[in-house]
Swiss-Prot record:
Name the record gives this protein: Ribonuclease HII
Subcellular location: Cytoplasm
Domain (RNase H type-2) ranges: 16-205
Organism: Marinobacter nauticus (strain ATCC 700491 / DSM 11845 / VT8)
Family: Belongs to the RNase HII family.
Cofactor(s) needed by this chain: Mn(2+); Mg(2+)
Gene that this polypeptide is encoded by: rnhB
């Protein structure tokens, strides 16, 4: 069945200080969820922006450099595995998005977020279904977030050989699940995720040691307003 086609997005905000926000890494079993916020410069257009998942790696890397060079402002946000375990992945994603927008060197007047919900924050905003293919600023954010997280997975692959992280980027593929149940759970795995929790019970920790569990406390009003 063909994917549902969405019409071009029409935003009520017509100014130039529009930030697009997207995330990468909600589904993986390991590592941070990474977000990005981008304000594009109308005077320096970036041809070829599209959903990062639909681009070849070569084109994605070229656009990554173009965005860093030509965007009016950009910022990355993140929540680590320990924060994901404390908050849950959905709330952690909201917090990581908030961190990305807070990090922009130019304050946005309006924010568009990929998906169907926005975090609770001070900026006027709205969610955009399939925004990474309908809004250029969100497309740019998706590219920055994906390239950043992919590189982090390649670095973790060096730290923790045998899991195949450079290939599957931490997603629960058969290769990853087999390695998890053979090698054990690393300090970067998300212990609140069921396959990781099961491997921890069955096999234990990778290398026989684990990082200390950090106590984390967050006010509830950081997160999405669902009223």
């Amino acid at each position: 069945m063909a994917a549902k086609a969405f019409p071009p997005f029409e935003c009520s905000y017509r100014g130039s200080l529009l930030a697009g926000v997207d995330e990468v890494g909600r589904g993986p079993l390991i590592g941070a969820v990474v977000t990005a916020a981008v304000i594009l410069d109308p005077a320096r257009p970036i041809p070829g922006l599209a959903d990062s998942k639909k681009l070849t790696e070569k084109k994605r890397l070229r656009l990554y450099d173009d965005i860093l060079e030509n965007a009016a402002a950009w910022s990355l946000g993140r929540c680590e595995a320990s924060e994901i375990d404390e908050l849950n992945i959905y709330q952690a994603t909201m917090l990581a998005m908030k961190r990305a927008v807070e990090g922009l060197s130019i304050a946005p007047e309006y924010v568009l977020v990929d998906g169907n919900r926005c975090p609770k924050w001070q900026w006027p905003s709205e969610p955009v279904i399939k925004g990474d293919s309908r809004v250029e600023a969100i497309s740019a954010a998706s590219i920055l977030a994906k390239v950043t997280r992919d590189r982090e997975m390649e670095a973790l692959d060096v730290r923790f050989p045998g899991f195949g992280l450079a290939q599957h980027k931490g997603y629960p593929t058969p290769v990853h699940l087999e390695a998890l149940n053979r090698l054990g759970v690393t300090p970067e795995h998300r212990r609140s995720f069921r396959p990781v929790k099961m491997a921890l019970d069955a096999v234990g920790v990778y290398g026989g040691s684990s990082a200390p569990v950090q106590e984390l406390n967050y006010p509830a009003d950081l997160f999405e307003n669902i009223d």
